[in-house]
Amino acid sequence: MNLTRNGKRIAALLFFLVVAGAVYFWEEEHARLLYAAITPFPEGDYWETLVNALLRDVVLLIVGGLLFLRRKRIPDRLQRYFPAVVLGILYLGFAWYMCGKLALDSYFLTTLAILAGLMNNIFPAILAAVWYHRNPSRGNKLLYFAVYFVCALLMLMDMVYFWQTTMHVQAVFFRNFNIYAIEGVMSSFSRNQLMEIGGFVLGVILLFRVTKPRRHKPNAAWALLAVLGWTLCCNLLYYTGSQVGLYALHESGLWSEEQIEKSRQEYRDMLATPIAGNIISKALFNKEKVVMATQHKKKELTDKDREWMYKLGVMRKAAPHPLPVPAYDRIVMLILESVHRDYIHCYNSEIPAEATPFLDSLIKQYPRIDNYYSSAVPTTEGLNATFRSQLLFDGDVDGNDKPSLFRSMQEHGFDGYFQSASSRYYNNEFRQYMEQFGMAHYEAREDLEKAGYSGASGWGFHNDEMYRRTLEQLKKLKGQKYFYVTKTLDMHQPYPYYATKWEETPESFRNNQIVTVHGMYWVDCTLRNFFKAAEEAGLMDDRTLYIITSDHNPHSGGEYTQLVKKEQDRLSVAPIPLIFVSKNTAPLENLDNSTYASQIDIAPTLLCLQGIKPPERFIGRNLLQQYREKESALGFFGDKAYYFSRDMHFVDKIDEPYPQHEYEDALANFVMYTYYVSGLPAGEVK
């Protein structure tokens, strides 16, 4: 008996040694071939890759060995915990997609991240299963199903969000969550994709299978301890391994690989994220505000921070130089909804030329900025950047004494008007906008309806009615000094619930299934009609400037990723149009069309154009002025700062404890410092 048992042990040991040897030689050959073409041969990178691969194989062998030792129990556990198995398979499929999308390696730390993520995402379902099998009842079965179904639906929602944004669900999703937002997301799917989603939901329901209650009940305490222990072990191994890996790379002198590894680590963390927990926390808490609050203690930038900000062109040593006299008496800003720069044919050949002929003609004829980026998303944050030259918006901070483009213009004799297509109650706009941005006159959907206008659906009034109202108001104000802003909505998903008739659509894209193209054709037509009517009404003259721009770039939608081909321009902060239209463009002759700029730059530019000194709290630059520092564009979304210039671009996580570069740490400090200063009462600003 002992001889037989010893023989089995020896056989198992020999089998393990053979497998281990085969794995080593296979991985060694693979690692050597990976660097064979490089001269001189990079020994450090070779060993780093080989050790990484072997550690991954060890982890997989351990997991496989544990499953083998418990192989007799596997059929029973598969039946008893089948819904959790379904969730696990869904997660593994999602993890595989994330790895491909984020270009993650398949080595040791990625494997640990997937194991941690697997346990994090099936943990609630396993607990519900243990509870049900311990106390079988109809109510507990319903609870089991609810936990399973909610986890599956949240995972589906996160998959869709990641597909559109390459991020897990963010808090901003819930700040704009309503029936129209849901319709907007759904409108971005084709019929086949909607059927696939419906099939997914139906499959999730049908795959909920539980065995009949058994006489032998699971030991709830032991089951909880085992599941919790394994989950904690996987997470501890992953996060410890991440830090040890960075330390090892640093000590071994592999500096470049260390910097790359820091970026990979952020992406790997997404694999380990408990999806349901993330979505629930983002729905209940605004992490961005938590990050901001923790940084309030930092009230000054260090000399090193300032040095980097000057090098990056984020800060400038020269003060803005306003013109000696106002260039215009009237400025009209037409703000489009969610329009990317590359939704215009002139910038993107994927858009048919017949879809945006008027916008193309304006771009060729008038001054514009070709590399003009959103500074924030969504609408309120984008308008905050436009009107207050700030990256971060906090509606809970009193804004009555805060500087803005409207307030500065109104203090110098210009009347301020803001016309919104949406309801005044949406996102508390009526209170927020007048308090934070300071326009003297605010008009929203309800006001237009009282004035007898019709033509609203979905989010609000359509472009044609908005422009008709604008023209009528401008006629009443003819000869006066004003700053008039019209904020449209028609490119907000779902669209087109408005549009030209099929027979009036150009044949070249009449049958085009990409609705964004049809939406942009409608935008183009309504703008053409607006400017034609303005010309006929005598509203186009040497003392009037019209500006066409967008509130922010589109942040989601399958068509967005289809139409915009350049990866850099599909980030959460991306280029939007900025066009200046006037019969007198001489004051704009110093504008460089190719410069890099963002929404925080438009307010100081317009004030300087009007001979008004911008408030010191404005962080943008005057685009009509030449600075010694380089030009740059700056944005913020989802606790990340986005930087763009002619020679570099990067994304900086604000609360990153170990930034890759000094300039990233400096930019994070700048963002939080300017947020702190922007919230100070007027008397406390130095």
Positions of predicted regions on the chain:
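Short secondary-structure boundary segments
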Residues: F82-I114, S188, T211-K212, I279-A283, ...
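Intrinsic-disorder-associated interaction segments
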Residues: L3-K8, E27, L301, P659-A666, ...
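A sequence-composition feature that detects small, non-aromatic residues
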Residues: A11-A12, A20-A22, A31, A36-A37, ...
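Membrane-interface segments at or immediately adjacent to transmembrane helices
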Residues: N235-Y328
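Transmembrane and membrane-interface helices of multi-pass
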Residues: N2-G277
